[in-house]
Amino acid sequence: MEKLSFELALKKLEESVEQLESGELELEESIKVFEQGIELSLFCRKELSQAEGKIQRLVKNLGGEFELLDFEV
């Protein structure tokens, strides 16, 4: 799979879902689109996991100083 941005991969995944939900694809094409959708889904999940690991938030502690804490979803 080519190197995609998260946003482009998500858009392509949404398009794949729409194609599959339309019911207009032949069986072989449906399987191909489904496989591509799985790859896109895994890519998006990986990108989100990596982003989650990088996110930190800044909070003010009781002493009035700022500290970095891991972001929790």
UniProtKB/Swiss-Prot annotation:
EC number from the UniProt entry: 3.1.11.6
This protein's UniProt keywords: Cytoplasm, Exonuclease, Hydrolase, Nuclease
SUPFAM superfamilies: XseB-like (SSF116842)
Chemical reaction(s) catalysed: Exonucleolytic cleavage in either 5'- to 3'- or 3'- to 5'-direction to yield nucleoside 5'-phosphates
Location(s) in or outside the cell: Cytoplasm
GO cellular component, one term: exodeoxyribonuclease VII complex
Task performed by this protein: Bidirectionally degrades single-stranded DNA into large acid-insoluble oligonucleotides, which are then degraded further into small acid-soluble oligonucleotides.
PANTHER family, per database record: EXODEOXYRIBONUCLEASE 7 SMALL SUBUNIT
Family to which the UniProt record says this protein belongs: Belongs to the XseB family.
The name this protein goes by in its record: Exodeoxyribonuclease 7 small subunit
Organism of provenance: Syntrophomonas wolfei subsp. wolfei (strain DSM 2245B / Goettingen)
Encoding gene (name): xseB
